[in-house]
Amino acid sequence: WILMSDKLGKSNPWYARFNVLLFLWVGVGFFTGWKQYSLSEVNSHINNFQIFRSSFGHFFQQMHLYPLYPKEYFDLYLYGPVFAVLMAPFAYLPLGWSVVLWNGLNAGMLFWAVWNLPMVRMHRVAILWIILNSTITALLNTQFHALCVAMILWSYILMQRGKLGWSALLIALGVFIKFYGIIGLAFFFFTKDRLRYSVYLVFGFAAVFAFPFLFGGVEYTWLCYQEWLEVLSHKNTLNVDIRNLRTDVCVMGMFRRITGDGTLSNLWFLVPSLCLSAWVYFQPKKWALLDFQLRILALVLIYIMLASTGTESPTLIMAFPGVGIWFVLGEKSRTRWGWFVLTL
């Protein structure tokens, strides 16, 4: 019913009511946080959150952010210094409360972003149901990616509403947390006030970049930025190892595993795909059209996962809002239904 209808009609069915959806989404966030915390071995079920939470203490004690700390968590911290500073509220709360609120924040912000997309209500409702399962997967891993895609959606929404300063700030924040926010720059040509947007972007990037220096000092924070780039390069090397079945779940990774060639370069796929995307994007007469903007939004959300060596099951929430937008905007043909079902 949700996916086949474009209008609510006179009725307001339970599955489309704002209060029902809000309760469901925030409830899912709180419940998954509580569930993962309540399981016996804490580090094995909320490990990602432990990494995020511990980064605050490491930063303010001026410890290296990016080595392994096996007594605290496993895996590596892969986020920028600004993220460590912003984890302050969660670091001071008791662990149980903080992980519940973390998941609630991720779920709530993504819900609120989708609900504010410039689309008819039934389309927004359909997208919320389409992405719910992948959101739960991300929440069960206490990941950041639901909040990350919410920030990207909000950077578009705010740009579309003319609030260019806030849009630019969110793009900058996304870049300096985990680079994914860079795709928000795809919305640059959708505003007529590009000069003002450019100024906001410059100031936004400068402000977010400089923010950690206020707390860590120049020498230590600069070292953190250098080590961040190094660990991302190291992580990419680990991701493309064909013996690692968890990550590199992208187009390039698929071909690396099919051919058994772990040295297959990403450029063979990135260059032609970026050229094709640019050909689709650079249609200036369509930049002001809402339908075109939404389709580009869907494109960049899906593309970032298809082309990232860091793609794994919990990160797919980054792409699924794009899948939802793509599906609801098009005619519900058998082909579209087939691709949609295959994607799910």
Role assignments for model-derived ranges:
Residues 88-91, 187, 325-328:
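Short glycine/serine- and small hydrophobic-enriched flexible loop segments
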Residues 313, 317-321, 325, 339-344:
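ATP/nucleoside-binding phosphotransfer catalytic cores, i.e., glycine-rich phosphate-binding loops
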Residues 32-33, 327-344:
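Aromatic-enriched
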Residues 1-3:
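Short, Lys/Arg-enriched N-terminal segments with co-localized hydrophobic residues
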Residues 5-166, 191-313, 320:
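Primarily membrane-embedded glycan-assembly and transfer machineries that use lipid-linked glycans
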Residues 171-189, 308-318:
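Transmembrane helices and adjacent periplasmic/lumenal helix-loop junctions
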